[in-house]
């Protein structure tokens, strides 16, 4: 459904270039002291059986990992916000050349030129990274712990809850809460989210 809806917003004759991002910070030594934070790119247009091959994913770059001078600094809200801001500004730096293609891009597929517009369709990440991408509170004990909707913690396991009983977390409504200084009411961090500007 997302694919069709998104493709309908593109100019006539253009197709969707589905970007899939994979991100996971990893340790690079046996002591766990050194870390790298790679971000990979794949395409949703590639069939799943092919997309899972090693050569169908490309390293887009490494996101910086900020190190605190001490535990006090590490726990400070200033440092935590700096980490979040750095993450989102780094994503902007990495993704802007792709996303800002105002007239799309022509790709040669089977000797035929096809007009595409790139859009991020999926971000694959673990819980802490999903929180960083969405800028939601990291604790599963927060009032609204879900990255996708504004369901309360008490209703997370409620199997009788209807989708109409919750409000989805969309770019627009999260941005509105942020711009109205109400981000804490929906458990998002006080940092501007790069993805709010994405088409």
Give the positions of each predicted feature.
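Acidic, metal-ligating active-site segments
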Residues: 22-68
């Amino acid at each position: 459904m997302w694919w069709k809806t998104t493709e309908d917003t593109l100019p006539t004759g253009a197709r969707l270039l589905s970007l899939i991002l994979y991100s996971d910070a990893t340790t690079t030594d046996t002591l766990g002291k050194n870390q790298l934070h790679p971000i990979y790119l794949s395409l949703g247009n590639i069939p799943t059986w092919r997309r899972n091959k090693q050569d169908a994913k490309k390293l887009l770059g490494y996101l910086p990992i900020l190190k605190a001078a001490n535990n006090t600094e590490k726990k400070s809200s200033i440092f935590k916000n700096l980490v979040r801001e750095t993450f989102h500004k780094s994503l902007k730096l990495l993704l802007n050349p792709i996303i800002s293609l105002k007239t799309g891009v022509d790709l040669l597929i089977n000797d035929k030129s096809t007009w595409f517009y790139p859009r991020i369709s999926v971000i694959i990440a673990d819980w802490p990274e999903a929180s960083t991408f969405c800028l939601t509170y990291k604790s599963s004990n927060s009032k609204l712990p879900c990255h996708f909707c504004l369901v309360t913690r008490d209703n997370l396991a409620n199997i009788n809850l209807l989708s109409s009983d919750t409000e989805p977390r969309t770019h627009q409504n999260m941005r509105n809460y942020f711009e109205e200084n109400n981000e804490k009411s929906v458990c998002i961090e006080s940092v501007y989210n790069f993805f709010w500007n994405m088409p």
